[in-house]
């Protein structure tokens, strides 16, 4: 039994809708052949090229290749997304940062100059609203980049910063000491990602206070935030983020990255409470992804539905109605690769590079991918399409799942199917908050209903 706050509500504007995830550097280049704003960035003009994967001279992977995707490019493709039935775009980080993934934030208050400007972001939000589309941002608040105005190990931002100046106002955000690799506490030992203390008052105020990071971007037009590694943020910090989000509007959305059942998680020496009404609106639904992909690959229907029902039974109804359901993300293999290709099984990037399923295996995989998305679009929660899945892009994990969108792709057979599924969600009330009722889950068959207040949808 999950006991949650009696007044727990989640945004009505999310329920029954469709999300689309974009990795900003790899979607569309609105301003072509732009100069690199920093000398240590490598521009990739060939949009069909594979992302860099070979280690550099010191054996590392710096994520320094940029394909030039930008905010203007996303704005140009709003009609395309609207045709796909997209209601919300979830963007991987857009704040200034010195890697193509931008999870090593350098400046929380400014768009990365390769993506555009703060004004470009506001223009994107305004243009998206005309299509009924909202923009959800990725907030990385458990760590910053070492190459940032806050830490500044590399010296890019002058003489200040916590690493270089013991009197820096940012010094108290971090832990320093000889017991740490590199002399400071970092995220999973990556020295380019110094961890912050989320209980430090000045940091909390910077992120969640009036005029802070959350407030600034929501007022610039964002529809909400996804919290990176929510498991590693204290519940009290998440609650303050929620307060900052809802202070702007109860309809602003707060999503968390959690890979398992979010109601049974333990951390910080206690059971986590972030999904019980005072923290997150909902979470990324990895258990559904695993169950659906395993089912279309041959896993018994009974086992897949048991895993799905477990989440439905554990999650508070307001959170279940807004859970983000997906088959691919920037952190996982693309769905078609999972369905149709060999598992990597620990094999390295050299083996993964250039792999592409073709022929009968591809055609069979495409049929199974279509079925998987039909399930994802009709289960409780909100479906999220990872950019490129609609044209059957392939790829193992980072960086192969982050190739540039193939705008000249011949494969277009999934697009109308996904658009029809989106239209179904928009026109059938049962897909907003309808109860999941299982009629049969055996012999490779899933047969269920979504039972709404006035309509019932039946799916086989």
Language-model regions: role of each:
Residues 1-13:
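Extended acidic/polar, glycine-enriched regions
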Residues 439-460:
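Carbohydrate-binding surface patches
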Residues 125-134, 142-143, 148-159, 213, ...:
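Active-site-proximal helices and loops of the catalytic beta/alpha 8
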Residues 22, 81, 91, 108, ...:
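Conserved, mostly hydrophobic/aromatic
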Residues 18-20, 89-91, 135-137, 225, ...:
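Hydrophobic faces of well-ordered beta-strands that scaffold small-molecule active sites
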Residues 25, 267-269, 273-275, 281-282, ...:
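Aromatic/acidic polysaccharide-binding cleft in carbohydrate-active enzymes
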Residues 19, 24-87, 94-220, 241-247, ...:
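Substrate-binding/active-site clefts of carbohydrate-active enzymes
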Residues 305, 309-311, 345-369:
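Aromatic-anchored helix/helix-loop segment that forms the rim or "lid"
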